[in-house]
Amino acid sequence: MKLKTTLTALAALVLGLSSAGAFAQVVGVSWSNFQEERWKTDEKAIKDQLAKLGASYISADAGGSPEKQLSDVDSLIAKGAKVLIVLAMDKDAILPAVNKAAQQKIPVVAYDRLIEAPGVFYITFDNVEVGRMQARAVFEAKPKGNYVMIKGSPTDPNANFLRGGQQEVIEAAITKGDIKIVGEEYTEGWKPEVAQKNMEQIITKSGGKIDAVVASNDGTAGGVVAALTAKGIKGIPVSGQDGDHAALNRVAQGSQTVSVWKDARDLGRDAAAAAVALAKGQKVAGAQTWNGGEKKVPLQAQFLKPVPITAKNLDLVVKAGWIQKDALCKGVDAAKAPAACK
């Protein structure tokens, strides 16, 4: 009887392990350009959540190449991915890969950047609101004068969502004549060096007569600040987003006005949970039907709430464990230090 009980227990254990393995999900993540600082945080959050859910993680980095991203998706599928999380380098170039996945009944999660294709699940922060927050912070600091708009990548739908939100805030002042836009440029690939070059050209064309810069993320803001600093231009309000450590340090130092914080830990966690649910054929909790893209394709979507971080509330990112105080306050003038650095 004892032997029979032991064998029964072993059989149950083996069956349980087999069942767990049978339902384990392989999640393939395609990164557009993993060299950017913030994606390291996203990846860790995705990995941690997948581990909690008993799923496994495989990934590929396109290194900024839309062509390589197509082959990356093929490779992830070949390696057994049952669901894909895709941070698209190019909203249009990625479509053949997304369509191929759909033909194989492999769900696709459009991560942070919109991919307009039927069946795609879209998860991001409210980018129109991010744009509003950026413009509000700059407008509060400089309600009149010459504005420069440094936009995101022309291949990323977020660039136009952000710009739309920014325009909502400053439109009335433009109409009134209080604000004049003296320069506006997209930033290929969201590259800081491209933003810096564009800003340098705008400074030259405007004769340095610039009062404020609405930059669409922290990378482009870094390029803007570098260009302004090189020309000896100080005290210009500059916006950004992502909560990059370098940007938060600039906010503490006073060279950047705001970084709209999109806690990538939340985005990564929720995207991983959505991916596993979709792979199991389940609905994603908290999702909504949305068709706000350029093509008006109806998608299931999930939007997270961003938080604008200025010198007044830098303590939030420290208390949240997003950045250490010494990194935040490095090089800050003690006489001008924000409360978070005292």
Please provide the spans of the model-predicted regions.
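Bacterial N-terminal signal peptides that target proteins for export
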Residues: M1-A9
